[in-house]
Design a protein with these regions (language model features):
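Short, conserved beta-strand element in jelly-roll/cupin
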Residues: 34-36, 45-62
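A short, N-terminal "cap"/entry segment at the start of jelly-roll beta-barrel domains
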Residues: 1-31, 42, 109-131
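Ligand-binding loop in jelly-roll beta-barrel domains
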Residues: 61, 81-108
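Short acidic-glycine-tyrosine-enriched beta hairpin
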Residues: 66-81
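Short histidine-centered beta-strand/loop micro-motifs
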Residues: 20-24, 33, 41-47, 64, ...
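A generic "binding-loop/recognition-motif" signal
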Residues: 37, 48-49, 67, 83, ...
Length: 131
């Protein structure tokens, strides 16, 4: 059994969101993701992993190619393998609990407009060019 207290695991950074892996289980992991107001994730996907987010506190907007959904405490979102998504934090600090599973969990980033220092990796450009 793995048992965690999300409030004692949280860690925030004003420059970028913080993800902390709390544990690994089988072909997956459980993490806590801490977001300051206004922070935005890259527009990305996990080609071989399902990703589930549960909003513990705070909130924001989750975008996919087909919809935009407001996320509030108690909400959870399931992204199947390969689904592009972007998280945009609302006006409050946000604490998300995340579960990823399905073998290879690395992500592919398509774009990150809110990060002027971001440059696409060759493997990401190749992945999206093939789609």
């Amino acid at each position: 059994m793995h048992c965690f207290n999300l409030k004692t695991e949280e860690k925030f950074d004003p420059k970028k969101h913080v993800e902390r892996v709390l544990g690994r289980v089988g072909e997956g992991d459980v993490t806590v993701a801490c977001w300051e107001p206004g922070q935005v994730s890259p527009y990305h996907c996990h080609p071989h992993a399902t990703e589930i987010y549960f909003c513990f506190e705070g909130g924001g907007v989750m975008k996919t190619p087909t919809e935009t959904v407001e996320i509030v405490p108690g909400s959870f979102v399931v992204h199947p393998p390969g689904e592009l998504h972007e998280w945009n934090t609302g006006p409050k600090r946000t604490l998300l609990f995340r579960v990823r599973y399905g073998g290879e969990m690395s992500g592919r980033t398509k774009e990150w407009p809110s990060n002027p220092d971001w440059k696409p990796r060759p493997e990401d450009a190749e992945y999206f060019a093939a789609r």
